[in-house]
Curated annotation (Swiss-Prot):
Protein name per its UniProtKB record: Esterase LipQ
Active site (UniProt): 249, 344, 377
Key word Hydrolase present: yes
One Pfam family recorded for the sequence: BD-FAE
Native organism: Mycobacterium tuberculosis (strain ATCC 25618 / H37Rv)
Top-tier EC class: hydrolase
Length: 421
């Protein structure tokens, strides 16, 4: 009986791997086409694009998707490695540094579910965090939020049992891709799956990309998406007064910039009066200072100059400074949880360390930083023990911020029962 059960799970895992592999192959094909377009204009970008491809589309992604469908408990057994233990310790320390040793008592989610880590007294003992898979309700994918066609579409992830009277907190996911390639799928699935399970609504967006567009079109679209969410998310059960944002790589740059430049009319042409503030940000392995070439991959500055900014840094340093989130740090910044891999070959972790330090120096009230040992760029794409631990830690961070907003209430209301009027 046990053998039959394992065989069945492995069979389902194989089918899932094929499906995910087909999707990833399609994404990689689109990426290669975009990369070819980039390289046509600048052979010097070969190293940058090749490195990005190897980081964003590794074979382990497909394997991780497959393993995630077999048995979360089985996967958990592999989490006792030194690297997983170190990641657990660092994530825990980052949250303790931000909120104190009893931070788990402050976590609150719409389901009222206590964090898995709190119940099991440690991230390594997680009994279950869902594998990366999309959770859409009817008519919640490819929704237009702006006039940009395919580049202005978003997906809404939500629980199917979310009651009409509910107002769930919202997390916006901004995809990475060197400001030039990739889209709203298949990034951040471990995190969004977890947040949806906890009763949140997640919104994954596309945005305009280079070389077809020039900076600041990218951030304008992200802010347009925030404005759309604030105006419309209540129709899908979301709370327009509690919006948070995340993203990886270029998406982290855009998420951080959006979080720090709320309601800046220069970045909101045509919708200057829209409220684009967010309540928290959790950027992964991002670029936060576009003026510091010493803290970049050697090919990043020429890449930015040629494809994204369409201007040389020496000719227009103000443009690069204005595009850098580190230029916008201030004492009223929303809470930040900054994450980076120690061995990131594409974006040095020094970018995140300097950014976190700048936030603290500016007087920002809540800044948490976790640098994960042995983690590379795009470490969260695969459904590994580490990516799931990171998702759980981010959910705890956002849960504390949400708990503050809700008056740090304990207990819960049933997700399927709207609040009493």
């Amino acid at each position: 009986m046990h053998i039959a059960s394992v065989t069945s799970r492995c069979s389902r895992a194989g089918a899932e791997a094929l499906r995910q592999g087909a999707q990833l192959a399609a994404d990689a094909r689109d990426t290669c086409r975009a990369g070819a377009l980039l390289l046509r204009g600048s052979p010097c970008a070969i190293g940058w694009v090749a490195g990005w491809l190897s980081a964003e589309f590794p074979a382990r992604v497909v394997t991780g998707h497959a393993l995630s469908r077999i048995s979360p408990r089985s996967i958990g057994r592999f989490g006792t490695s030194w690297a997983a233990q170190r990641a657990d310790q660092i994530l825990h320390a980052a949250l303790v540094d931000a909120f104190g040793p009893d931070f788990r008592d402050l976590v609150w989610h719409p389901t009222g579910e206590q964090s898995e880590a709190a119940r099991r007294s440690g991230l390594l003992n997680l009994p279950h965090i869902p594998g990366p898979h999309r959770r859409y309700a009817a008519q919640t994918s490819d929704i237009p939020y702006g006039p940009g066609g395919r580049e202005n579409l978003l997906d809404i992830w939500r629980r199917p049992d979310l009651a009409p009277g509910r107002r769930a907190p919202v997390l916006i996911q901004v995809p990475g891709g060197a400001w030039t390639i990739n889209g709203k799928r298949p990034q951040a699935y471990p995190l969004m799956s977890r947040m949806v399970e906890l009763g949140w609504i997640c919104v994954s967006i596309n945005y305009s990309k280079s070389p077809r567009c020039t900076w600041p079109a990218h951030i304008v679209d992200v802010k347009r998406a925030i404005a759309w969410v604030r105006e419309n998310i209540a129709d899908y059960g979301g709370d327009p007064d509690f919006i948070t944002i995340t993203g990886g790589s270029a998406g982290a740059h855009l998420a951080a910039l959006a979080a720090l430049s709320a309601n800046d009319p220069a970045l909101q042409p045509g919708f200057e009066s829209a409220d684009t503030a967010v309540q928290a940000a959790a950027p992964y392995y991002g670029v936060y200072d576009l003026t510091n070439a010493e803290n970049m991959h050697e090919m990043m500055m020429p890449f930015l100059e040629h494809f994204v900014m369409r201007s040389r840094y020496v000719d227009n340093p103000g443009l690069f400074k204005a595009a850098s989130p580190i230029s916008y740090v201030h004492s009223e910044a929303p809470p930040f949880f900054v994450l980076h891999g120690e061995k990131d070959p594409m974006v040095p972790s020094a970018q995140s360390r300097a950014f976190s330090a700048a936030l603290r120096d500016a007087g920002a009230a809540t800044v948490s930083y976790a640098e994960l040992p042995n983690a590379h760029h795009a470490f969260d794409l695969a459904a590994t023990v580490r990516s799931r631990m990171v998702a759980e830690a981010v959910s705890d961070f956002l849960g504390v911020i949400y708990g503050r907003r809700m008056g740090a209430r304990k207990g819960s209301l049933a997700l399927s029962s709207p609040p009493a009027s």
